[in-house]
């Protein structure tokens, strides 16, 4: 296939269409700094904190204090990398009404900064926590607290 193949207009058209399509998909490589919709944000963060509390051995439950950053990547679903600040509440693990728990007072205050990779297919309400890492807030840089 030398230079002569480009004389065929059909081959030229196919090559142009393929390069345009490949260029379109290359723009979506990697994670993008995009805002989540409020609905997706709430459901993703609720899933995260429930997963964290279920895996934690702490006496008190945590709740999300603040979303610091979110990034997304489209795959077969949506992958989110979320960085959040979470804090101890006054509710203990066995409390049933934990949806509106107030944060601990200064004496027992404990805050963590967590970065998590969450895979979701929000259209079927499916969530999976793929990776999570948390540090105490005082050990993290000021811009993340």
Swiss-Prot record:
GO molecular function: cysteine-type endopeptidase inhibitor activity; cysteine-type peptidase activity
Domain annotation Cystatin: ranges: 37-115
Signal peptide: 1-19
Broad class of the protein's primary localization: secreted
GO cellular component annotations of the record: extracellular region
Annotated localization: Secreted
Keywords: Disulfide bond, Glycoprotein, Protease inhibitor, Secreted, Signal, Thiol protease inhibitor
SS bond list: 91-101, 114-134
Family: Belongs to the cystatin family.
The name this protein goes by in its record: Cystatin-like 1
Name of the gene: CSTL1
